[in-house]
Amino acid sequence: MSLEPIKFEDGVAYERMMGVWSQLVGSKFLNWMSPRKGQRWINVGCGNGAFTEQIVRHCSPNEVQGIDPSEAQIVFASNREGAQIAVFQTGDAMALPFAIDYFDAATMALVIFFVPDPALGVAEMKRVVRPGGSVAAYAWDVFGGGVPTAPITAELRASNISYPLPPSVNASRMEVLYSLWVDAGLQSVETRVITVERTFANFEELWSTNALSPTLKPVLAKLPEKTISQLQNAVRERFPADAKGQITYSSHANAIKGLV
């Protein structure tokens, strides 16, 4: 089976599948950053604006810029009621359209492993942040089973079914993140693992939500019904429902921050 590149073209589907997870992690991440109010922020790879909205709600920023290569995601983000002060535009994480030392804080939420050259992406965040400002990111721990789609991808691997990975997937490793930050010349670098839980009303919700993932959707669409049924049964066995029929599981992200 040929693998299609992971594409983010549906802001609504992404909100249902990943937006909830993103905000669960994002809340803990922002508390860890402990930023001052009234700052200038840039959220690189803002996607559909889920994390940008959290910056607006929790950090009382003076300015927020959101950059993403997907026009569809930018359109969705621009219509978020909770992020109306933010300015969203399409752009390249490796060539940010801003002047040196302009921002107080730069973030990448679940993005760095999608940047073709992560080192250049970190260098660009550092370039546009003032001395003393913060450069921070978090990424699902792909190799440690921390990705929200892990219930299904684990069974795909067990069945020898291939699925696409982010182009710079090694950047999800904590040791790689640390090296990227240190090699960029950032100071006072700190790391932590952020673990969150999500509860699904039933198995059908768990499956249909994860099936919206741009990683899984094109793969599942090409599988015969018999294989889909076998995968579903395997996931049910791995994640049994509670007495109410609900299923709860955790995901975790590797987080890092440093000062310019």
Where in this protein do the model-derived segments appear?
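A short SAM/SAH-binding and catalytic strip from SAM-dependent methyltransferases
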Residues: D104-P118, D141
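Conserved alpha-helix/loop element of class I SAM-dependent methyltransferases that forms part
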Residues: V20-Q39, Q54, H58
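Class I SAM-dependent methyltransferase Rossmann-like catalytic core
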Residues: F8-V20
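A short acidic, Gly/Pro-enriched loop at the edge of an enzyme's catalytic core
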Residues: M94-A106
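Short, well-ordered alpha-helices that flank and scaffold nucleotide-derived cofactor binding pockets
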Residues: N31, E53, R57, N79, ...
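Conserved catalytic/acceptor-binding region of the Class I
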Residues: A119-L120, K126, R130-A201, K217-L220
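Conserved Class I S-adenosyl-L-methionine
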Residues: L3-F8, N48-A50, V169-V260
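Class I SAM-dependent methyltransferase SAM/SAH-binding core
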Residues: R40-L96, L120
